[in-house]
Amino acid sequence: MKIIDKKIEQFAQYLQRKNNLDHIQFLKIRLGMQVLAINIEKSIVVYGLAIIFHTFFYTLLTHLSYFLIRRHAHGTHANSSLLCHIQNIIFFIIFPYLIIKLDINYFVLLSMALVGLIITILYAPAATKKQPIPRRLVKRKKILSIFLYCTIVVISLVTKEPVNKLILFGVILESLTLLPIFFPKEDINHGKHF
C-alpha cells in the first residue's frame, strides 16, 4: 500500500503544480484519491472472496441495497481498515450465505426490516465527526433514506427468493449502522449537523 500512497502523493503534487492549487485543495485531492484507492482495494478483497466462495450474487445484492440507503443515511464506520475488512467479510459474504443456506424465513427478515425502517426514520442521516452533514442537506437525505428504504422493502414483496431476503438484509444492516450505540464515545458530533 505504501507504493500506492507514494504514487497518489506524486500525482497530487503534479496536479497541484499543473493547476496552481493551494495547500487545502492539494489535501482534498490527495484525500479523494486515497479514499478511492482504499475503496477499490476493499471491493477487490470482498468480491474476490465472494467469487472464490461462490457467493458473488448474494454479496452483490446485499451490498447494493445496503449502499443505496447508506449513500443518504450515512452511519458509523469501522475503527480501522482491518476491522472494516473483517466486518465486510462477515456481513457481506458469510451472513448472506447463512441467510440462504439456513433458509431464514422471509417474514422474519421483513419484521426486522420494519424495525430498521423505524431506526432509519429516527436516526437518518447519521453524521460522524469525520463525515459531518451540512445542515442544508439533512432534510433531503432523511427523505431520500426513508423513501429508498420503503422502496426496497416494497421491491422485496414482489421479488422471489433469494433476492427478497438478500435485499432486506442489506437495508437491515445499514439501519443498524445508524444506531447511536455503535458510534464511538469520542464521536461527539453524532446526530449534529453543520
From Swiss-Prot:
GO BP annotation list: proteolysis; quorum sensing
Domain of life, source organism: Bacteria
GO cellular component, alphabetical, reads: plasma membrane
Q: Which SMART domains match?
A: AgrB
Q: According to the UniProt entry, what is the EC number of this protein?
A: 3.4.-.-
Keywords of the record, alphabetical order, are: Cell membrane, Hydrolase, Membrane, Protease, Quorum sensing, Transmembrane, Transmembrane helix, Virulence
> Which membrane topology describes this protein?
Multi-pass membrane protein
GO molecular function terms here? peptidase activity
InterPro entries (alphabetical): AgrB
Q: Which sequence ranges are marked TM in the entry? A: 44-64, 80-100, 107-127, 142-162, 163-183
Q: Which residues form a coiled coil?
A: none
Its main localization is: membrane
- Compartment(s): Cell membrane
Q: Which family does it belong to?
A: Belongs to the AgrB family.
What does the record give as the function of this protein?
Essential for the production of a quorum sensing system signal molecule, the autoinducing peptide (AIP). This quorum sensing system is responsible for the regulation of the expression of virulence factor genes. Involved in the proteolytic processing of AgrD, the precursor of AIP.
HAMAP family tied to this protein: AgrB (MF_00784)
> Can you say what this protein is called?
Accessory gene regulator protein B
Q: Which species is listed as the source?
A: Staphylococcus epidermidis (strain ATCC 35984 / DSM 28319 / BCRC 17069 / CCUG 31568 / BM 3577 / RP62A)
